[in-house]
Swiss-Prot record:
Its EC number is 5.3.1.9. Pfam families: PGI. It is found in: Cytoplasm. InterPro entries: G6P_Isomerase, Phosphoglucose_isomerase_CS, SIS_dom_sf, SIS_PGI_1. Catalyzes the reversible isomerization of glucose-6-phosphate to fructose-6-phosphate. The active site is at E282, H303, K419. The keyword Cytoplasm applies. It catalyses: alpha-D-glucose 6-phosphate = beta-D-fructose 6-phosphate. This is Glucose-6-phosphate isomerase. It comes from Mycoplasmoides gallisepticum (strain R(low / passage 15 / clone 2)) (Mycoplasma gallisepticum).
């Protein structure tokens, strides 16, 4: 499902990589398999994919059917961090074109008043509902968003608004849990042993994917396959996620590359790059010892950052993502109807996708010639199944990479720092 290529890393000795890392990777493999990592109580994402999801699927299908009967056309999804980025990444893969979207999704994912006003204006004359995602119900951003949008929903629908709210939260306790129980809102679980950035294909992502009309169950099937593949062996030659983690560590510690730039040539996959940034940034950004993950969308960013990437200080490496079935070569250029005044007839019969592919190949050659190490990650399916596979693959790679650095992949003390200071100021 995933092909990892790294022949554009000059000076890499694969035998040395294997010799230096295999024993460490074997140890990490055992830690993950036997739940012996730091914060081992947060490893629920590993076994979650193999659990019986029948009850959750039924609840999701029932809610979709109910909202179909109510003719709900728009959904406000309220969440932040892992409760936003991953869900948006799913939607952009499974329902990117307007014709693929059964419902319009609006995200509340910050404390931007203008964003709140914009979305309130967008839904005020629509038939809409709310999905609110918060484990505790006390995180300020989603709490404030839910307060404002719940008031607007009740103002429009009165007591009928109760059927138009789904709370995804801790199934046993918390402010949002108590609100849902009190008002008899549909409630789906956030699992206490799965952190936000590792929760994309739990009910929060599954429900929203289902609401737009995607085959959301395939997200789990793809992740199941990834687990079977990645927990079979820790050998570098057999485990691409472990190889990727080792390459990142090698480039950072041995080749002194401090920045990783995740790159896509499809705007459709920008939020996948953001998800990559969150997974690695939040899991590894500790103790003043980590790669700095960022991303670019090409060819757009070639016209803003391309100069820096080509001729700037080489403190970075690139990880280029591609999806084999992302494009269907539907848009082909024809002979000009205006006497070739645009001078593009030499491109006749070529598709826009082919042009994008050539741009990708040319850029890789140019950057590699300038000494930029390049890792390539090719995913075979641009689908719910493919997303599920890639997401689980990234979760494994993130965990291994953080553990190689000696970090706890599953905590985020720096985030808690700002929260404490914010509440103190309020």
């Amino acid at each position: 499902m995933i092909k990892l290529t790294f022949n554009l890393i000059k000076g890499l000795d694969y035998k040395k990589l294997d010799k230096n890392y295999q024993a460490k990777l074997d140890e990490i493999f055992s830690q993950l398999k036997n739940k012996k990592t730091p914060s081992a109580n947060m490893l629920g994402w590993i076994d979650y994919v193999d659990q019986d999801h029948t009850k959750i699927y039924k609840s999701i299908d029932n809610k979709i059917t109910e909202w179909d009967k109510l003719k709900v056309t728009d959904v406000v999804v309220i969440g932040i961090g892992g409760s936003f980025t991953g869900i948006k990444a799913i939607l952009d893969v499974v329902a990117y074109l307007p014709s693929e979207q059964k419902r319009q999704i609006h995200f509340i994912r910050s404390l931007s008043e203008n964003s709140f006003l914009k979305i309130l204006e967008e839904v005020k004359d629509k038939n809409w509902g709310i999905v609110v995602i918060s484990k505790s119900g006390t995180t300020l951003e989603p709490s404030v968003g839910f307060k404002l949008f719940r008031e607007a929903l009740y103002k429009q629908y009165g007591e009928q608004a109760q059927k138009r709210i789904v709370a995804i939260t801790d199934p046993k306790k918390g402010v949002l849990h108590d609100i849902a129980v009190k008002n008899k809102y549909e409630m789906l679980p956030i699992y206490s042993d799965i952190g936000g950035r590792f929760s994309t294909i739990t009910p929060s992502g599954l429900l929203v994917a289902g609401l737009v009309g995607a085959d959301y169950k395939q997200l789990i099937e793809g992740a199941k396959k990834a687990k079977a593949d990645l927990f079979a062996s820790s050998e570098l030659k057999k485990n691409s996620a472990y190889t990727y983690a080792a390459l990142r560590h090698y480039l950072y510690t041995e080749m002194k590359k401090d920045v990783e730039i995740a790159i896509t040539y499809e705007e459709q996959h920008e939020y996948l790059m953001l998800q990559h940034r969150q997974l690695f940034g939040e899991s590894e950004g500790k103790s003043l010892n980590s790669l700095f993950p960022t991303y670019s969308v090409f060819t757009t960013d070639l016209h803003s950052m391309g100069q820096l990437y080509q001729d700037g200080k080489k403190i970075f490496f690139e990880t280029v993502f591609s999806f084999e079935k992302a494009n269907k070569n539907k848009l082909k250029l024809k002979n000009s109807e205006f006497n070739n005044d645009d001078q593009l007839d030499y491109l006749t019969k070529k598709s826009v996708n082919q042009l994008n592919y050539v741009a990708c190949e040319a850029t890789k050659q140019a950057h590699a010639s300038a000494g930029v190490p390049i890792i390539e990650i090719d995913v075979k399916e641009n689908s719910a199944y493919g997303f599920g596979y890639l997401y689980f693959w990234l979760c494994v790679a993130t965990s291994v990479s953080a553990l190689l650095l000696g970090h706890d992949p599953y905590n985020q003390p720096g985030v808690e720092n700002y929260k404490q200071r914010m509440f103190k100021l309020l």
